Amino acid sequence: MKTSIERKPLRPASTQALVGREPAAPESEPMFDLIELFFFAYRDFVGDADRLLENYGFGRAHHRVLHFVYRRPGLAIAALLDILKITKQSLNRVLKQLLDAGFVEARAGATDRRQRLLFPTPKGAKLAQELAILQSERFRRVFGELPPEAREATADFLLAMINASDRERVRAHLPPRRRRRQLPEDDAA
């Protein structure tokens, strides 16, 4: 039986309401339960893709590059570096492997021939799509076990996990319906 998600914080009138529950940790205490849940959820989420990527001799870095090149054909290398928050040196090996294996191609920019724009090849698009379907299946299974509001609550949570100073840039890459959602601290950033 599904229950609805309440967005109101629990504020019991007395500690009697907490009988049978683990007391909340003081604000200064590490949130080990959430840290560990996040770790295990991430491990399993990326693990699905990792197993497929192993067939190609690729890893998570290849997945990240391929994902954003697939989602944004014509992405400039500088923009990819900014999205991934890595150095050009860190990107070079991974990008070279994707280029050499025929999953990504680089083209000169139309206005600036020195600029390199990245595009997925048909083979790269196929792999990116397979990876996205694999990870989407996990989301669908999980959301199928939760109330309908869980998807929006999860999206709000993940958006809130992004540094406020970077949130607008990330939001610009999201579908229009997701861009409209504002978090309270967005106004302060």
Which sequence ranges carry the predicted segments?
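Short, locally clustered residues in the helix-turn-helix/winged-helix DNA-binding domain
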Residues: 39, 67-71, 132
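Exposed, interaction-prone assembly regions rather than primary DNA-binding/catalytic cores
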Residues: 150-189
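N-terminal leader segment of winged-helix/HTH proteins
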Residues: 1-56, 183-189
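N-terminal helix-turn-helix DNA-binding core of bacterial DNA-binding proteins
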Residues: 47-90, 101
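Charged, amphipathic alpha-helical coiled-coil/dimerization segments
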Residues: 6-8, 17-20, 46, 96-159
